[in-house]
């Protein structure tokens, strides 16, 4: 999506991918949502747009998978990876180190004291399907908590609260056919 504000791959990376494909005698081309009608002309779909369940990328991924195409990001991966609540529970189950977390429900009374008692202060509130800091608020006191809850509960009735863990990077792990393909550091933009 050339109009995407925070694309997962820049133009230079996409052009490099096309160069490598050409060297390997693979016909590859960049397609957009407008090319959806041509999807079945291809053998594989490699999505390089930020995916979400209510986005055309998910529908294209489903269509490609249903028609037997190789798909990266496949529909199940999109469902799993765009849901922070699911990922948090998976990390707990598999004993993968992660920031301390707890679920916050709209139907409960939520106070700064009770959350910070478990997670410390400050802490982060996240909607389950946010990305690139969308739907995420850092909370340092009761006033900020109330404002964040008012804003975020308009988007989701369940929030994930996590201890604040300053870091210069996140990890990105690529999985293909259930096997780890790569691990890389995803560095934060300044002021993030």
Report the location of each language-model feature:
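Phosphate-binding site of ATP-dependent enzymes
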Residues: 134-192
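A short linear hydrophobic-aromatic micro-motif
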Residues: 30, 100, 122-125, 158-162
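Short acidic/polar capping segments at secondary-structure boundaries
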Residues: 2-4, 77-78, 106-109, 128-132, ...
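Conserved residues at the C-terminal ends of beta-strands
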Residues: 48, 104, 186
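Short, hinge-like loop/turn segments at secondary-structure boundaries
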Residues: 46-48, 89-92, 117-120, 142-143, ...
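Rossmann-like NAD(P)H-binding beta-loop-alpha module
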Residues: 99-122
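Conserved N-proximal alpha/beta basic substrate-recognition cap immediately N-terminal to
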Residues: 1-100
């Amino acid at each position: 999506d050339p109009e995407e504000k925070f694309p997962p791959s820049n133009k230079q990376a996409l052009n490099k991918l096309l160069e490598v494909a050409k060297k390997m005698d693979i016909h590859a081309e960049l397609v957009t949502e407008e090319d959806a009608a041509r999807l079945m002309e291809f053998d594989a779909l490699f999505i390089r747009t930020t995916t979400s369940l209510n986005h055309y990328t998910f529908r294209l991924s489903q269509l490609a998978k249903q028609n037997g195409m190789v798909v990266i990001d496949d529909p199940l991966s999109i469902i799993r990876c765009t849901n922070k609540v699911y990922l948090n529970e998976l990390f707990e189950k598999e004993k993968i180190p992660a920031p301390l977390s707890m679920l916050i429900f709209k139907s409960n009374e939520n106070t700064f004291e009770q959350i910070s008692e478990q997670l410390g202060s400050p802490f982060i509130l996240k909607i389950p399907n946010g990305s690139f800091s969308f739907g995420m608020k850092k909370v340092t006191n009761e006033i900020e908590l109330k404002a964040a809850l008012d804003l975020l509960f308009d988007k989701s009735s369940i929030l994930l609260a996590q201890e604040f863990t300053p870091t210069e990077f996140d990890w990105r792990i690529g999985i293909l056919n259930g096997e780890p393909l790569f691990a890389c550091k995803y560095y934060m933009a300044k002021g993030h």
